[in-house]
From Swiss-Prot:
Name of the gene encoding the protein in the UniProt record: MEF2
PANTHER family, alphabetized: RIBOSOME-RELEASING FACTOR 2, MITOCHONDRIAL, TRANSLATION ELONGATION FACTOR G-RELATED
Cited function: Mitochondrial GTPase that mediates the disassembly of ribosomes from messenger RNA at the termination of mitochondrial protein biosynthesis. Not involved in the GTP-dependent ribosomal translocation step during translation elongation.
Keywords: GTP-binding, Mitochondrion, Nucleotide-binding, Protein biosynthesis
Residue intervals of the tr-type G domain: 13-297
Protein name: Ribosome-releasing factor 2, mitochondrial
Species this protein is from: Yarrowia lipolytica (strain CLIB 122 / E 150)
Gene Ontology molecular functions: GTP binding; GTPase activity
Amino acid sequence: MASRHYSAKNTTKKIRNIGIIAHIDAGKTTTTERILYLSGTIKHLGNVDEGDTTMDFLPAERERGITIASAATSFNWNNHTVNLIDTPGHADFTFEVIRSIRVLDGAVCILDGVAGVEAQTEKVWKQASEMGIPKIAFVNKMDRAGAGFGRTVKEIVSKLRTRVALLTVPVFSKSSDQVFEGVVDILNGCVITWTTGGDGKQTVVVPVSEASAEVQEEYQKARTALVETLTELDEELVEKFLESEDYMQITTEDIKRALRTATINNDIVPVLCGASFRNIGVQPLMDAVVDFLPSPAERPPTDALIAKSYTGGKKSKVIPERAITLDDSMKNLCCALCFKVVQDPQKGTLVYVRVYKGELKQNSVLYNTTSGTKDRVSRLLKVHADTTSEVTSITEGNIGVILGSQGLATGDTIVCHSIKKDGVMKLPPDNRLIQLKPIAVPPPVFFVRIDPASIGDTRPMNEALELLLREDPSLNVSFDDETNQTTLSGMGELHLEIAQNRLIEDFKANIVIGPIIISYKETLNEPTKSITKTVEPEPGAVSTVRLRLEPITEMDEACENENVIDHEQNTVSFPYELSDADLESVGEGNQRISFERDTKELTPEIMEECFRVGSIPPLVSCGPVCRLPLRSVRVVIEAWHIAQHINNTASLKTATRLAIMEALSTANATLMEPIMNVYVSVNEADIGLVVKDLSGSRNGQIVSIMDPSQLNEGDIHSEEYVAMATNTYVPADYTMYLSKHQDQTRTQQSVVHARVPLREMVGYLKTLRSMTQGRGSFTMEVDQYEAVTPDKIQPIVDSIFA
């Protein structure tokens, strides 16, 4: 494969890193296929239903017709390099969406013109907004009966809470069935129509002045509304307007400048429409991506951390982490984030990276600041789904792939010297501690047991699991030494199903997989007695700790010097300085321990790390009921002692671990289970069945039944955007009457909000589809963990040990 450089025109200002986000089935992958085809990147149009799309290249994706992994592709549009990521829409793959959004500079949100703003649309929109990602909206499927462009635009304003700028509005044929055939381009003052049944390349462009009177009137309304909205955000445009006092006299160039600024500042969202499956409206969408979404140079400086470090010797101390931004003062630094790892059956390990600073060159020596290891870049690629082209470097702001590295995992930060290929160790020491803010992994709630089919299959199984975890850190693998069982946990049923398929089909692991099990936890019913443990690894090197465990309730206030141990809401509190009474009682029986050392060597930060690290192992795997992880437990360090000549805390960590294990061995504990907030969208006719099922056989509690527009009722900001939506210009939805039944079905949907134990939601999607003839949908998220009722404990224990 020939290597090649990208030409000088591909500077940072000419780069667009964008992602496609949406609810499942809104048309993300289909839109991407059309973009690739119209840009000349592919020669054949793929079809999701036929399983031959370019971006959905995993076998499981083509089989199910859904996107699972975020495929990345690069192409050219209007003399710009566009790096595009097609993300999943299914809620089980939220982490895949989050880690993709992390590396974007802009996003295109695809909406179904019939369904409007859906549950997952709101979720991914919120995720992008929290990261400050500018967005464009594309109302898709305008060729479908019941599609409502105006209605969907108003939902964008009210539900997604944003101003909008309409750049295209739909055009329909004058026949009785009013076929969607094109758009009015508001910026350029023309009507664009596409040949029916064509591939999207054949268009007819007519000036608005030559269009019908109705189209001319709609164009004037839309352009006036666009300029009027922008004058609320741009003072320079106000001055232009005051010169003529006519919105129609504002030039296209002035509108584009103001709109670009407002979009990049997240003050407004450009909105376009089309029908990707019919190849209509895609070119104006891509023109808008280039014209209005930011380049990497127009995004805020990249935030990073200088990681916590330690100085050695007798005066050892912790240097706390500190926040920084990557700027021009960091000479010769190349810094990149590994945001995705894929095991390709032909090419091997593909590590997708976004370069935030400097230039990543072939054959450079890398330093992985996450793991503290070095590696070398052998080959670099630009990727188009499952095809690649080799490059000699990846420039600042660009996205590419490192081929063949075995030491990199999703979320790792890598640094190297931008000029000297082996100069990484010549960078300032702080540069080798830089960590781009890690991608937060949500805690998993489902798990399955995985066993090798035979003893000889154990090693291949473990190797396959290691590869899988490098790809997807939202999966978690744990091993129980006592039962010799391996457990794989994930975000949902589909998530684990896909992971199992990857292990068997792609990694050829010969394994036996158990049924889906819920992620139960354990907690204490009451405090334990105090336990004292002494460790003496060598004569005179005594470390002693006295501690107790107690449950944390919602009413508890944090203790002094209390520190969070893990994401299970476990904490540890300890006294940094001990009183004489504490010291006299540290020992057991007649033993008295004196405390005479100079504590300057053992700073509060070092002691916090000591007790936290010592607490983690037993809290993860020593639950007294089922050896499950503990939750909402406070480790109270009552007293501690380290012999004066010891300069580290290793033995005290051991004493802490052993003391917690002993305390747990006789603790009064119970099980906790995840309680989910479940939101079920159903037609009014199906509400009775759904409510009966949730509150009856599934032991759920119905919180409310409401219209979707009421979900944020009472929120002053929500009310503000509802009012804004009412006053937002939109064209009339002439085609909605063509599907009165479908529109009625949609507008009469309600949302049932219930709190349901997760164990009762396993397999719920199939039941819901059966009850609603396939029309119902639901989302759920963890509300909190609650104690299992006594009558349910033994059946759950039996199922865990089955």
